[in-house]
Amino acid sequence: MREKIDVHAASPGAEASRTLRIDLHVHTLASDGVSDVEAILEAAVKAGLDAIAITDHERIDAALAARAIAEGRGSPLEVIVGEEITTRGGHLVGLFLRRRIRPWHSLRSSVARIHEQGGLAIIAHPLVPYPLCASARTIRRLMDEPDPVFHPDGLEGFNPTTARMRWSRRAPAFAEEVGIAAVAGSDAHAAHHVGRAVTTFRGEAVAGLRGAIARRDTGWEGEPYTWREQVRMFGHQQRKNAAAIRDEVGGKVRRDGTGRDLGYPGGRARPARFDRTAAGLGEGERA
């Protein structure tokens, strides 16, 4: 039986018109997801979300494509360009990015790089004793830095992948202790998981997310993934990886050198590029 968690936080005097729901952690075929951008966008609309953040590992090209497609269609869904960055201190989600953040730098410098381009830095699935998860000690050390450029803006108080682990249950209280916002995202790797966990806040538009995080005025809704769902997803990812290897080996013959399809317009190339024409955009239109 699924355990649904619904936590809303709002300042008593907040003037706002409605509760907005945003999934801040979504992967596509461009990294280790198994669904293409079109399927992700469709699922987000069906889930009634106001926005999603595409946060592929170490890349933002599919996120740029998703945003351009949504805007080009006049969709009410907003797409936040993000990235899940592998740092030496654990995974870090960057939101509202303009440029890719390179992996394997320190967590401290990666947070600063996100802030330098006007983005938000969110610690992904914290506290779990695993190399890809930031420890409490590491996060406290960042928050003790005298320069706020090194301070993360928030951490995942709920991630359905790790929510059943006892360490993750401490995350909301830990966020309160160190003085940063607790948010949530589905960490979806397939379209049908989009919206499984969302960040909520009171506001009039998605642009208000920045202020809500700064005020620590966010809540979340979510359901943990079952172990069966996680095992099934691992199997899907392994089959995808096997197919990708076949495409890499056979791509020159089948596609005249274009390589594997990364699941968005213009994605059939390495290194990946965003093809404006394939997305239905002219040269003068913004991506």
Give residue spans per PLM region.
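Core dinuclear metal-dependent hydrolase active-site scaffold
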Residues: 102-105, 115, 119
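Short glycine-enriched loops at secondary-structure junctions
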Residues: 77, 81-86, 127
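Divalent metal-dependent hydrolysis catalytic cores, especially in the metallo-beta-lactamase
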Residues: 29, 40-61, 119-122
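Aromatic-lined carbohydrate-recognition surfaces of secreted/lumenal glycan-active proteins
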Residues: 122-132
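Flexible loop residues that form catalytic
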Residues: 57, 126, 160
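Charged catalytic cores and adjacent phosphate/nucleic-acid-binding surfaces used
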Residues: 1-30, 34-43, 61-67, 74, ...
